[in-house]
């Protein structure tokens, strides 16, 4: 077995004309196969770490074999080998599986009609909305829409509920008393795709050159590695190249497992279809209804529209919210405000559509580090590793002012390679403590290339801050700082909002959703007995008919009573009974209060009545009804006669004192004489304590008080005034009215 002796292996790091050499070692490798047992040869193994996005000549491996040792004799080789290795950008490939098509914007058409002409039955020959037919010419179930009718209360002018798409007028049975509601679809349709698990993909190209004695470089062959073909061998078996593995990207691909990809598909001439990938969207799976039975979801069908709960008491379009057109337009508004969209592809990263192995693939370009290890096994003696160190600068950089936690902060920087070679650069970031760390980025720029770098910026605090700062540093491939810029920016405090009330923390009442439709859900009005019949709700239909018959009978009875003159007397009788009952109760309560007030407030010492003699007598109601016992105690006949006289005179006011009941009694503990009169026009109460008569204040008594002044008061008041003057009663107080017996 022969062993080949190697010289030193050199790695060259070249910046223009300046080079730096680092020594390396070699290894021995033996291959044992059944064809050539114990066939060992000396191999030089080069292990390279290739970064994401490297371009031609950014990283170059030059291997030169210049001498061998054979039986202790060193021999110089005339030809050498050169290997150039490049790596394509790392991308994530998302296979797509077609799901189904969805309309961009379903619309509701409202047709005004009458109670008797609106038709929505499946077996109607010509329903108001017309039938839609499938590709086989069969009627599509529920494509005939549905009808909404003005209820009986609306026709009678008593309805106040929301009516879908119609304005109901009293006594209107013609046009406008019913409406037909039809589901129509807009011309634009989207195709939806399931998104499969991503796979990382990149390619590594290895160019093998031979260099002759005239130092001419000739391409010998090219090896092309990829994630699909990780191992390749040269045609002369002198070189073997392998992909060992790829490190997990520092910025991994987006997680799209909970989304569908939707893209405008037809008509092909639609402007949005022609826009291409810029109008594609990622939409959460929960926003779709695949069977079309759910309202306010993408994919709502004729059945979902027609069978919606309480349809005729909902606003027009209530079942057709949150459609693809709504999502697209909302993102356009966000973009116009320089905000991040929610559904367009750029909300998740940088995406493109590619055809890969005959399959439609969604491709996402990855930024950040994604190193790949490869090995190249060669029969070489000396290896040079060349890395171009670029000269660059940061020409512009800025961070916009933004709201904390809004996700709208953005850093923009222009980086230029000022050298004559393609080179690797590194951007590093050092920001103030309240700014979330920004991940460093590796850039691979061609000669004199100007690159626009941007990334998101966020802060950790909810409160506003002035003069936040970030420093951007530009380094070359081995960490030499080439340029540095400092950026100042401001943030405003987080604007807290809530959809559950006017302010954060407010709560609205919870809503309960039914999983199945009841009869009341199917028919919007209790009076729509024809709706109950059509829905199979027989019991509710008969209840509705009985209620309508009851209301009609009551109306007929009222009309009959009014026509024959019975209605007004009945109403007066009922009102009179009600008012009397309430009036008696109020007077009883008021009497007790007035009586107590007199007992507490009256302080007169004069007395024409004492408690030494007790006598009983009766006063007969002049209007023929009842007798009541009056128990009085008097010390003199004149006091008794005078009080009795006053009572009789008050009772003789026949014009107004048409009492149904008169009674009087004496409270033995307080010596209060009470005179009650229950009249049609007012309640009259007269108290006597010692020598004071009291009349509770009301409208009639006020009228009497007014009669104490000349030329004022009603007829009743004038009569009352005559009694006051005739019996020489002295007015002590007018509010309430106190009369003193002289």
Curated annotation (Swiss-Prot):
Cellular component per GO, a single term: plasma membrane
Q: Where in the cell is it found?
A: Cell membrane; Cell junction
Residue ranges annotated as Extracellular topological domain: 20-540
**Residue ranges of the region described as Important for membrane fusion:** 152-179
A single GO BP term for this record reads:
fertilization
State which residue ranges cross the membrane. Answer: 541-561
Which InterPro entries does the record associate with it?
HAP2/GCS1, HAP2/GCS1_dom
What Pfam families does this protein's entry cite?
HAP2-GCS1
Which region is the signal sequence? 1-19
Q: Which residues lie on this side of the membrane: Cytoplasmic?
A: 562-742
Question: What does the record give under GO molecular function?
Answer: fusogenic activity; lipid binding
Q: Please report any disulfide bonds recorded for this protein chain, giving both cysteine positions.
A: 30-40, 118-147, 129-182, 148-312, 150-168, 295-319, 431-470
Isomerase recorded as keyword? no
Report how it sits in the membrane.
Answer: Single-pass type I membrane protein
UniProt keyword annotations, A-Z? Cell junction, Cell membrane, Disulfide bond, Fertilization, Lipid-binding, Membrane, Signal, Transmembrane, Transmembrane helix
Which family is this protein grouped under? Belongs to the HAP2/GCS1 family.
Q: What is known of its domains?
A: The region that is important for membrane fusion binds to lipids and can insert itself into lipid membranes. It is unstructured in an aqueous environment and assumes a more ordered, beta-stranded conformation in the presence of lipid membranes.
The note filed under miscellaneous reads:
HAP2/GCS1 family members mediate membrane fusion between gametes in a broad range of eukaryotes, ranging from algae and higher plants to protozoans and cnidaria, suggesting they are derived from an ancestral gamete fusogen. They function similar to viral fusogens, by inserting part of their extracellular domain into the lipid bilayer of an adjoining cell.
The entry's function note states:
During fertilization, required for the formation of intercellular membrane pores and subsequent exchange of gametic pronuclei between cells. Probably initiates the formation of intercellular membrane pores by inserting part of its extracellular domain into the cell membrane of the adjoining cell in the mating pair. Mating requires the presence of HAP2 on at least one of the two cells. Mating efficiency is high when HAP2 is present on both cells, and is strongly reduced when HAP2 is present on only one of the two cells.
Q: What is this protein called?
A: Hapless 2
State the encoding gene.
HAP2
């Amino acid at each position: 077995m022969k062993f080949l002796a190697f010289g030193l292996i050199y790695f060259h790091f070249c910046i223009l004309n300046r080079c730096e050499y680092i020594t390396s070692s070699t290894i021995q490798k033996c291959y044992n196969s059944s064809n050539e047992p114990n066939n060992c040869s000396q191999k030089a193994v080069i292990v390279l770490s290739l970064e994401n996005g490297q371009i031609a000549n950014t990283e170059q491996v030059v291997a030169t074999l210049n001498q061998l040792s054979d039986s202790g004799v060193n021999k110089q080789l005339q030809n050498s080998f050169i290997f150039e290795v490049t790596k394509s950008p790392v991308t994530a490939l998302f296979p797509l599986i077609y799901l189904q098509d969805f309309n961009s914007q379903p619309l509701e058409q409202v047709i005004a009609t009458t109670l008797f002409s609106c038709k929505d039955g499946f077996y109607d020959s010509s329903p108001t909305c017309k039938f839609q037919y499938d590709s086989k010419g069969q009627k599509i179930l529920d494509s005939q829409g549905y009808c909404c009718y003005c209820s009986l209360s609306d026709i009678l002018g008593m309805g106040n509920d929301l009516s879908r798409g119609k304005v109901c007028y009293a006594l209107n049975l013609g046009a406008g008393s019913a409406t037909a509601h039809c589901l129509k679809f807009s011309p634009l349709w989207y195709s939806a795709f399931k998104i499969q698990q991503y796979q990382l993909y990149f390619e590594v190209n290895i160019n093998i050159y031979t260099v002759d004695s005239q130092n001419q470089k000739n391409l010998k062959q090219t090896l092309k590695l990829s994630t699909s073909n990780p191992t390749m061998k040269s045609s002369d078996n002198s070189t073997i190249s392998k992909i060992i593995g790829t490190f997990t990207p520092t910025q991994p691909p987006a997680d799209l497992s909970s989304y569908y990809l939707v893209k405008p598909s037809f008509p092909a001439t639609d402007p949005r279809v022609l826009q291409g990938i810029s109008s594609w969207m990622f939409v959460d799976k929960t926003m779709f209804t695949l069977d079309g039975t759910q309202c306010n979801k993408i994919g709502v069908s004729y059945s979902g529209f027609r069978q919606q709960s309480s349809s005729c008491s909902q606003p027009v379009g209530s079942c057709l919210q949150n459609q693809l057109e709504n999502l697209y337009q909302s993102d356009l508004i966000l973009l116009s405000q320089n905000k991040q969209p929610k559904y367009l592809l750029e909300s998740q990263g940088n995406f493109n559509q590619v055809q890969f192995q005959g399959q439609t693939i969604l491709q996402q370009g990855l930024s950040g580090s994604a190193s790949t290890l490869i090995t190249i096994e060669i029969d070489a003696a000396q290896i040079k590793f060349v890395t171009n160190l670029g000269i660059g600068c940061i020409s512009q950089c800025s961070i916009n002012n933004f709201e904390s936690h809004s996700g709208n902060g953005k850093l923009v920087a222009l980086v230029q390679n000022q050298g004559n070679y393609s080179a690797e650069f590194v951007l590093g970031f050092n920001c103030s403590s309240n700014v979330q760390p920004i991940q460093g980025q590796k850039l691979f720029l061609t000669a004199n290339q100007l690159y626009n770098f941007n990334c998101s910026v966020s802060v950790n605090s909810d409160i506003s801050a002035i003069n936040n700062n970030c420093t951007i540093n530009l380094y070359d491939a081995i960490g030499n700082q080439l340029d540095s810029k400092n950026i100042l920016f401001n943030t405003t405090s987080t604007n807290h909002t809530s959809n559950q009330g006017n302010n954060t923390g407010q709560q609205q009442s919870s809503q309960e959703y039914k999983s199945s439709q009841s009869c009341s859900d199917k028919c919007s009005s209790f009076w729509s007995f024809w709706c109950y019949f059509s829905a199979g709700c027989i019991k509710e239909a008969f209840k509705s008919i009985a209620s309508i018959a009851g209301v009609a009978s009551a109306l007929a009875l009222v009309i009959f009573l009014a026509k024959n003159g019975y209605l007004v007397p009945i109403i007066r009788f009922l009102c009179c009974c009600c008012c009397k009952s309430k009036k008696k109760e109020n007077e009883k309560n008021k009497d007790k209060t007035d009586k107590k007030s007199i007992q507490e407030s009256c302080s007169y010492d004069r007395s024409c009545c004492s408690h030494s003699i007790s006598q009983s007598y009766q006063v007969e109601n002049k209007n023929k009804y009842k007798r009541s016992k009056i128990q009085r105690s008097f010390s003199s006949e004149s006091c008794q006669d005078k009080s009795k006289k006053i009572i009789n005179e008050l009772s003789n006011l026949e014009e107004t004192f048409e009492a149904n009941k008169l009674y009087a009694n004496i409270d033995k503990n307080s010596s209060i004489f009470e005179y009650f009169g229950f009249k049609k026009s007012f309640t009259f109460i007269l108290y006597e304590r010692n020598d004071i008569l009291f009349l509770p204040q009301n409208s009639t008594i006020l009228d009497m008080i007014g009669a104490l002044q000349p030329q004022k008061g009603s007829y009743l008041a004038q009569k009352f005034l005559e009694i006051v003057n005739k019996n020489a009663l002295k007015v002590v107080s007018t509010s309430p009215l106190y009369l003193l017996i002289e």
